[in-house]
Swiss-Prot record:
Expressed in the brain (at protein level). In embryos expression is evident in the ventral forebrain, but a lower level is seen in the remainder of the embryos. In the adult brain, expressed in the cortex, cerebellum, hippocampus and basal ganglia. Keywords: Cell membrane, Membrane, Signal, Synapse, Transmembrane, Transmembrane helix. This is DOMON domain-containing protein FRRS1L. Its main location: membrane. One of its GO terms (cellular component) is endoplasmic reticulum membrane. It is found in: Cell membrane; Synapse. Residues 46-60 have a biased composition (Basic and acidic residues). Important modulator of glutamate signaling pathway. It comes from Mus musculus. Residues 119-234 form the DOMON domain. GO terms for biological process: regulation of AMPA glutamate receptor clustering; regulation of glutamate receptor signaling pathway; regulation of postsynaptic membrane neurotransmitter receptor levels; regulation of synaptic transmission, glutamatergic. Residues 29-60 are annotated as: Disordered. It comes from the Eukaryota. Component of the outer core of AMPAR complex. AMPAR complex consists of an inner core made of 4 pore-forming GluA/GRIA proteins (GRIA1, GRIA2, GRIA3 and GRIA4) and 4 major auxiliary subunits arranged in a twofold symmetry. One of the two pairs of distinct binding sites is occupied either by CNIH2, CNIH3 or CACNG2, CACNG3. The other harbors CACNG2, CACNG3, CACNG4, CACNG8 or GSG1L. This inner core of AMPAR complex is complemented by outer core constituents binding directly to the GluA/GRIA proteins at sites distinct from the interaction sites of the inner core constituents.
């Protein structure tokens, strides 16, 4: 037995060929995009097949594709609207004149017995915590305002105005009177603002702090002031001169802690209430009586 060469089993060459074939198959994996013409694409279509690239959609931007598909399928309704419509805005709560003199103070200017919807001008105020809530309404399509004055005259006054603009909105703005002109002040103390233009009337509601940092354009409402009442037209959302030459004002200073319901007749209803007219009537009556035989 010694001296004879060792023989390899017959199955060894076969095993080597199988191993080499397996290595070659791994180098040309079906998942490899670099496979040759005999390989297969990512969808299993042979690279050599006609129209292979056209049939397999490519996603160059996975995020962009996801976003567009998500938007198209999730947010577009059958009618083609991208988003559901927003819920309607709460309507403007009607001003309650029955609370005047009880839980809030009111000023009415116009026809006797008028209310917030029929007076030429209407103002109410009430305390809510550290704020004062104001409600204003006037027979105008422009603006309505209240001024806080120390002398019942225009000039150097703190003014809050509700202005109806060309877009149909009512905005609350802060002004400072310089003589007969109102200059808008960017520092606006108003909050919780709401307003509406209906039936040719501008109506609004807002709150303002009672105490504010010292500023010549903003007064402290815990002090008593004369209230100036004004309204007039607006051009492209900018206020113009008020409707009457001498706007009405409170007869005395107003305290926000005292609630009264004060009526002031407009000029059309002052004919027989002014002292001059009453004196004229008395004189005419006396003359007629004396002249009667």
């Amino acid at each position: 037995m010694a001296g004879q060469p060792l023989r390899r089993p017959a199955w060894v060459p076969l095993l080597l060929r199988l191993l080499l074939a397996g290595i070659a198959a791994c180098d040309a994996s079906p998942a490899d995009d670099s496979a040759g013409p005999g390989g297969r694409g990512p969808r299993g279509r042979a690279r050599g097949d006609a129209g292979a690239d056209e049939a397999v959609p490519r996603h160059d931007s996975s995020y962009g594709t996801f976003a567009s598909e998500f938007y198209d399928l999730r947010y577009l309704s059958e009618e083609g609207y991208p988003f559901p419509t927003a819920p309607p805005v709460d309507p403007f709560a009607k001003i309650k004149v029955e609370d005047c003199g009880r839980t809030k103070g009111c000023f009415r200017y116009g026809k006797p017995g008028c209310n917030a919807e029929t007076c030429d001008y209407f103002l109410s105020y009430r305390m809510i915590g550290a704020d004062v809530e104001f409600e204003l309404s006037a027979d105008t399509d422009g603006w309505v305002a209240v001024g806080f004055s120390s002398d019942k005259k225009m000039g150097g006054d703190d003014v809050m105005a509700c202005v109806h603009d060309d877009n149909g909105r009512v905005r609350i703005q802060h002004f400072y009177n310089v003589g007969q002109w109102a200059k808008e002040v960017q520092r606006n103390p108003a909050r919780d603002e709401e307003g509406v233009f209906e039936n040719n009337r501008v109506t609004c509601r807002f709150k303002r702090p009672v105490n504010v940092p010292r500023d010549e354009t903003i007064v402290d409402l815990h002090l008593s002031w004369y209230y100036l009442f004004a309204w007039g037209p607006a051009i492209q959302g900018a206020i113009t001169r008020h409707d009457i030459d001498s706007p009405p004002a409170s007869e005395r200073v107003v305290s926000i802690y005292k609630y009264e319901d004060i009526f002031m007749p407009s000029a059309a209803y002052q004919t027989f209430s002014s002292p001059f007219c009453l004196l004229l009537i008395v004189a005419l009556t006396f003359y007629l009586l004396m002249g009667t035989p």
